[in-house]
């Protein structure tokens, strides 16, 4: 019988492509008895272009590589100091719709930021989480065979300047924010556990096993 347990992998700082490939392989080979997983990772600097991404939103990538991704959404930037959380969930088994998962991920971030005294909100017209008009978290998902992969990217204490080389998520002039603007002591090391605790709470607190790479 299936046990509701989630494997949480802390992968540290990794290049984007091998992690993306591993995520695809996991999703393609999982079956009904495969446990869901959550991967916590930071990436070396990279622009990722979403499945429907338009080239004109990549303004001047310079020395940062641009990699095509099959997630939803337009172009975004990943770099050290940004906490990425990939959610590899069997949505059918969890009786979660795609829209419900997006809402759950946005609420995870809103709740995490509220604990830090930062008031944040989602926007109906542009997925993600915002503080005022500034975007602090990007979302992009893909569903295959009833299972989700990709996830969210929360700006913690990263260098935001590479976002100026793109129209983030397809919005010209979209300003970005990071947690350390309000909480200078914030690091991915102290934000990741809060993020994890909040998503597990919204998934009804399943058992979990924490695995470090």
From Swiss-Prot:
It is found in: Cytoplasm. The active site is at residue 169. Substrate binds at residues 71-78, 138-140, 151-153. Keywords: Acyltransferase, Cytoplasm, Transferase. GO terms for cellular component: cytoplasm. The record marks 135 as: Lowers pKa of active site Cys. GO terms for biological process: protein modification process. InterPro entries: aa-tRNA-synth_II/BPL/LPL, BPL_LPL_catalytic, Octanoyltransferase, Octanoyltransferase_CS. Its EC number is 2.3.1.181. Its main location: cytoplasm. Pathway: Protein modification; protein lipoylation via endogenous pathway; protein N(6)-(lipoyl)lysine from octanoyl-[acyl-carrier-protein]: step 1/2. GO terms for molecular function: lipoyl(octanoyl) transferase activity. It catalyses: octanoyl-[ACP] + L-lysyl-[protein] = N(6)-octanoyl-L-lysyl-[protein] + holo-[ACP] + H(+). Catalyzes the transfer of endogenously produced octanoic acid from octanoyl-acyl-carrier-protein onto the lipoyl domains of lipoate-dependent enzymes. Lipoyl-ACP can also act as a substrate although octanoyl-ACP is likely to be the physiological substrate. Belongs to the LipB family. In the reaction, the free carboxyl group of octanoic acid is attached via an amide linkage to the epsilon-amino group of a specific lysine residue of lipoyl domains of lipoate-dependent enzymes. NCBIfam families: lipB, PRK14342.1. HAMAP family: LipB. This is Octanoyltransferase. It comes from Escherichia coli O17:K52:H18 (strain UMN026 / ExPEC).
């Amino acid at each position: 019988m299936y046990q509701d347990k989630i494997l949480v992998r802390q992968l540290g700082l990794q290049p984007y492509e091998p992690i993306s490939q591993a995520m695809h392989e996991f999703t393609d080979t999982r079956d009904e008895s495969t446990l869901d997983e959550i991967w916590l990772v930071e990436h070396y600097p990279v622009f990722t272009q979403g499945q429907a991404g338009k080239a004109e939103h990549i303004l001047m990538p310079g020395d940062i590589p641009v990699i095509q991704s099959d997630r939803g959404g337009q172009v975004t930037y990943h770099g050290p100091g940004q906490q990425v959380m990939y959610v590899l969930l069997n949505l059918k088994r969890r009786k979660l719709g795609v829209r419900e998962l997006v809402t759950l991920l946005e609420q995870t971030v809103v709740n995490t930021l509220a604990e830090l005294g930062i008031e944040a909100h989602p926007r109906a017209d542009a997925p993600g989480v915002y503080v005022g008009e500034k975007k602090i978290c990007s979302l992009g998902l893909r569903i295959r065979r009833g299972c989700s992969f990709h996830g969210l990217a929360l700006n913690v204490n990263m260098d935001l300047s590479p976002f100026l080389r793109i129209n983030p998520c397809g919005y010209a002039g979209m300003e970005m924010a990071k947690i350390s603007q309000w909480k200078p002591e914030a690091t991915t090391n102290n934000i990741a556990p809060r993020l994890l605790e909040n998503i597990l709470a919204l998934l009804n607190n399943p058992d979990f096993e924490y695995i470090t790479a």
